[in-house]
Amino acid sequence: MNKSGKYLVWTVLSVMGAFALGYIALNRGEQINALWIVVASVCIYLIAYRFYGLYIAKNVLAVDPTRMTPAVRHNDGLDYVPTDKKVLFGHHFAAIAGAGPLVGPVLAAQMGYLPGMIWLLAGVVLAGAVQDFMVLFVSTRRDGRSLGELVKEEMGPTAGVIALVACFMIMVIILAVLAMIVVKALTHSPWGTYTVAFTIPLALFMGIYLRYLRPGRIGEVSVIGLVFLIFAIISGGWVAESPTWAPYFDFTGVQLTWMLVGYGFVAAVLPVWLLLAPRDYLSTFLKIGTIVGLAVGILIMRPTLTMPALTKFVDGTGPVWTGNLFPFLFITIACGAVSGFHALISSGTTPKMLANEGQACFIGYGGMLMESFVAIMALVSACIIDPGVYFAMNSPMAVLAPAGTADVVASAAQVVSSWGFSITPDTLNQIASEVGEQSIISRAGGAPTLAVGMAYILHGALGGMMDVAFWYHFAILFEALFILTAVDAGTRAARFMLQDLLGVVSPGLKRTDSLPANLLATALCVLAWGYFLHQGVVDPLGGINTLWPLFGIANQMLAGMALMLCAVVLFKMKRQRYAWVALVPTAWLLICTLTAGWQKAFSPDAKVGFLAIANKFQAMIDSGNIPSQYTESQLAQLVFNNRLDAGLTIFFMVVVVVLALFSIKTALAALKDPKPTAKETPYEPMPENVEEIVAQAKGAH
């Protein structure tokens, strides 16, 4: 295509995007079609990638395709494997796309579709994709080192140890929240529990099949896996309807918690080829296939958004999560716009598979844009269902139906209707029946709500093929595999971080080839996130209300730390005139997270502040005036949970401020030095036969 043709294409895309955004903005007080949001989003993503991503690659970072990458330099067929860019894009996307882009936008829908949509689009273009791309570049230039090692190398050993401790603590919180979403989705759901449990022996079979029966036949085993996944969903319906089998898969939240802790330990110590790799194949195909199917379904169905652009809860009084639009919307959405967790993948993991530095923009910037698109579709799925159903599913049980309520559904319908979102008990019972569940009341965590929206979209788009219950449990399986893949990989990553920390005390514990050291570190990791998971599951307010804000604050603070590192590297590269690219999102993230952290820790409002909530419930215990919806032990649990969350929030705030001071100190020192001081691996030219190397490595990979 000639230059004028290219200009015409981008002009048309710009006009389409502007028109779609204008239509959304001008239709105030009217219900609009979800298609407008999808069109506007795709146009913005394409324009951002083509222009802003390219600007960062060429001008800010001066990406050099002739420079040898660590994957080529250390090509060992194990950790360092130069990988085809399309294959690597899939691996990177599978690693970064956890629960955040699925759940955060669903929870954010409490305030209406408009605030979440704006932040998802602006945040990913200016912050999230920038972080992923720049961290990938920085790590690639330093032999694929991890985030903590990069901070240590560029800012000094003290800052490095602080960053490593913070990364481990944040990873623990992230894993606890991810696991809690699975628990909330599977509690008292025999169909869902059976289907997810079925994938464990299936993954083990696939691992043995690939290792011993048909080595290297990934496509073949993936087809087998897909067939058995469909069988698992169908047979799950039979199990749920069986009075004999259903009780064997009907578990409480606490029972599922201990099962997940045990699973997490076993999955982290088993060989990667036996469970993790096959589950990756399953989840990657399911993720990409479902995302494409959902996008096509929205195009076919063109559903109307029933959630208003702004709800009454923008004032911070919402039942799903508490706090004003600023700053809490920005920490609630989390991964769909910007995620610190991605920095742990973009450093240390993906750089060791990057065949050419010139592909970093496609993998880093492009991969994050894809995740944001997933988040947009999650937002759409949540906003097309009846708002009354949305609030009945996501509000805490203590709010909808206090302990001892005879008719929970009727009570929930009455409470939600009093908020201005009219809903009847018959409607709630009908939806529960259609999706094959005993109840949909207070199915907090976002995942069940997303599954309901997805089920109706896919059911309608395919002309009624299979019933709604099938598609609901298909969506639950999709979400569970999405999340469990991250729990598996995250537990292993946390184990490596913990072994690095334990190695400071006892060098022998740092050895990853030592079975006792591995078992000890893994046990400590799963007990750490398992503890927070248990606290969230038994929390009378649903867990999400307290743990998700802590997760959001910690995750966004980690993103701020990663962007601080990127800004420091630009100063040390003598490219400080471009440092604004990293400093602007850093400043915004620090403002949001420190404001949110301060309010969650110290706000006197008992609906917002952790300490205020703890003091309120402690006063009830001391006075003996226990509300009917709680027991004394539940109040004691709430007091402890909130005080612990306050302590962690304060710790994360101190860490990010200290690292900000180290960043300023390092940047000022770099300005005084007339020469570049960035500690990059010395330049080596890319071998001429790099394409042949990538092709050969494909088999090893």
From Swiss-Prot:
Subcellular location(s) of the protein: Cell inner membrane
Presence of the UniProt keyword Cell inner membrane in the record: yes
Cross-referenced InterPro entries: CstA, CstA_N
Cellular compartments per GO CC: plasma membrane
Induction data: Induced by carbon starvation. Induction requires the cAMP-cAMP receptor protein (CRP) complex. The carbon storage regulator CsrA regulates translation of cstA by sterically interfering with ribosome binding.
Claim: DNA-binding is one of the keywords in the record: no
Residue numbers on the Periplasmic membrane side: 28-33, 108-117, 182-189, 239-255, 302-324, 394-395, 461-463, 545-550, 599-643
Residue ranges crossing the lipid bilayer per the database entry: 7-27, 34-54, 87-107, 118-138, 161-181, 190-210, 218-238, 256-276, 281-301, 325-345, 373-393, 396-416, 440-460, 464-484, 524-544, 551-571, 578-598, 644-664
Residue ranges that the UniProt entry lists as topological domain Cytoplasmic: 1-6, 55-86, 139-160, 211-217, 277-280, 346-372, 417-439, 485-523, 572-577, 665-701
Pfam family, one: CstA
Bilayer topology: Multi-pass membrane protein
UniProt keyword list: Cell inner membrane, Cell membrane, Membrane, Peptide transport, Protein transport, Stress response, Transmembrane, Transmembrane helix, Transport
GO biological process, one term: plasma membrane pyruvate transport
GO MF, any single term: pyruvate secondary active transmembrane transporter activity
Cited function: Involved in peptide utilization during carbon starvation.
NCBIfam families assigned to the protein according to its UniProt record, in alphabetical order: PRK15015.1 (NF011590)
PANTHER family reported in the protein's UniProt record: INNER MEMBRANE PEPTIDE TRANSPORTER (PTHR30252), PEPTIDE TRANSPORTER CSTA (PTHR30252:SF2)
Family in the record: Belongs to the peptide transporter carbon starvation (CstA) (TC 2.A.114) family.
UniProt protein name: Peptide transporter CstA
Organism: Escherichia coli (strain K12)
Name of encoding gene: cstA
